[in-house]
Amino acid sequence: MSKNVKILVAAHKADPAIRQDEVYIPIHVGKALHPELDLGFQGDNTGDNISEKNASYCELTAMYWAWKNLKDVDIIGLAHYRRYLNISNDDILNFFRRSGIILPEKFHCRTDNYTNLVSLLTHEEAILAIDTLLKMHPDAKGSIQRYFYQSNRYSVFNMFIADWNTFNEYCSFLFPYLLKLEHRLSEPSYSRLKRNLGYVAEAMFGFWIEYAKVRTKYVPTVDLSPSPYGKGLKKRVRDLQRDLGFILAYLPIHQKPYYYGAALHGLRSQGIDVDNI
């Protein structure tokens, strides 16, 4: 049986590397912020959309647009204009004989996933990210402990390919969570980076896979720009070194999030409820 496969290619500018065919569909992310710019393809500012939030949500505005506006799609994905998953259309169809999701190969951190999240945000933002998750999903405490504090691997870029039902389940988890977190972050201005919610979503993808027990396949990423993560043997050696350091040196003394410190005190002193932490 044939399936309707659509993979959105998030782009904010014209580039000859942008893939465009019956499967790969370019989408202009943040179109609402730049109405004067016409890239000649679909914008994320039509129908039900959050295009104006692109500065903080990054490529997630394309994901939201697909969730709310695409119809009759069996398999949906998201790539970047210079980065996509290295998998053929035939292999995509073979995998989706059953439900599941395809993600980029995991990035190996030197620390646990929570500490890595702190390095991308502020400490206050990271605390609120975990506390908001616990408020909305109190049954997820075990998954949070395993994924954020006992693991050093996660998939980056917010790229994926999924059957529509799995995609709908993830979006139904992700966007209410991000909107709630965005509201909490806007009360005190803790954000130092506009792209904070995009970074949070990268971490949440892997958490949700752990929490929802989704069938998953990991594939390499094709990066048409110089990759900050390395390639080939050099990358494998680096990943092994980081894993050994994490298991032998970091994990034994960091299994509990003891290092909230002044950030947690500062949040509470401003009357912000973080009692789940």
Indicate where each model-derived feature is located:
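ER/Golgi luminal nucleotide-sugar-dependent glycosyltransferases, focusing on the catalytic module
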Residues: 1-277
